[in-house]
């Protein structure tokens, strides 16, 4: 099973500045650390991949998780994580760190619901966030 991370922002002006390098880094990291569970294989099949779509909405107090949506032709199981967004807040390191923490925590919640092991991820949460924020190539300049 591979894990893929992408972003979709349907609401104009409501988005986080993470780019394709961020998506690739997180996809590679999750694919290396997460193994399919028997529950996932029983529900969808061992050949299915897991997709996380990051998005944002104004007016949310906490993340909103939608899914799963199953794409049988592509053999994908997709979840969308809508993060809280506030246009009045600067996209500084604190804001981005909070968004990443909420995103990763939501992903871990989904993985745990699917009986996938997340101990390595949970233990490395701060280091993963620091790695992303420390690499300017993963964040588009405003």
Predicted regions and their residues:
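Sequence/structural signature of beta-propeller modules
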Residues: 1-140
């Amino acid at each position: 099973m591979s894990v893929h991370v992408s972003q979709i922002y349907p609401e104009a002006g409501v988005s986080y500045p993470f780019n394709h390098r961020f998506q690739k880094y997180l996809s590679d990291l999750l694919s290396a650390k997460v193994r399919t569970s028997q529950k996932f294989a029983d529900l969808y099949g061992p050949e299915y991949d897991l997709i996380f779509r990051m998005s944002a909405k104004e007016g949310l107090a906490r993340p909103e998780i939608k899914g799963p949506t199953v794409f049988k032709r592509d053999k994908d199981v997709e979840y969308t994580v809508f993060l809280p967004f506030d246009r009045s807040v600067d996209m500084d390191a604190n804001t981005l760190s909070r968004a990443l923490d909420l995103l990763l925590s939501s992903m871990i919640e989904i993985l745990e619901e699917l009986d996938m092991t997340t101990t390595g991820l949970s233990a490395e949460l701060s280091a993963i966030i620091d790695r992303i924020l420390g690499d300017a190539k993963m964040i588009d300049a405003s």
